């Protein structure tokens, strides 16, 4: 038997605002940051987790993670790792902690970092990357770790098992393909709003011609004339065969979004991302209906599985963009993938930032190897 002996946190920050990297209409000066946690045991091993932020407030998340150390220190490691649903319940269903959410905000993100660290430790002890550990779990075993409270009007545990069972066929081939080819992605490197036209065009060509990306994304929403000019320049730079998405980062009201997006109709958009407030389920539904067939994409600031359920039930988007560090770790992400499969919605997780690509990789790879739903 081993026990958890130490929970160590770090406040990492990078001055990305100095070069406008990460800049958009809502967040013009982000300093990419990470609230990082290491959960250590008396056996000498450890698991790592983190939360991505954009600067101020990163210390608040660190303190929230610190506050959970008393729940972990002294715990039997094997008891937790053998029953990850118990680990989930310790934090998500804590009768006092949940008052701070419930299941949203700093408290929920901090829980996600801790649960991710435990999953990381579980994978290390199994001698496998986390994505492979998840992919190789039997459907019943994986579903037993999941919390279906508030979801059963949309997805039951048995439906989840059936979805995963149906995905077993061809899984070995998909795992082999993933190991050989990797997971598809797109680039936002050219698209930050603070970049000059010249820099945007240069990077758009570099990302597509040199790096080989088949899709780029531009930030929009600050000035319509600028958006139209940049879209025109980007399309001329990359040609007709490269997909272009745009991202407004929640800056528009609903009528404004519909009007603004209407001006983009000539640019064959892959999707319009975060057109309005992430809590506005019906507003997104109205936008999706108005701009169809252009897909609405959103999810990076959705706080929990219940929000995803409501978005899906309302037909509010066509592309789900889960943020791996905003929700409560791998278990909640798997639930959201299963919901996407149930409702036939594509998935393209939120990435970039400090560590987000690394955080989303295990669940993205799992998503591809299961697979639970079509991916973008």
Can you say where each PLM-predicted feature lies in the sequence?
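Substrate-binding cleft/loops of secretory-pathway carbohydrate-active enzymes
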Residues: 357-365
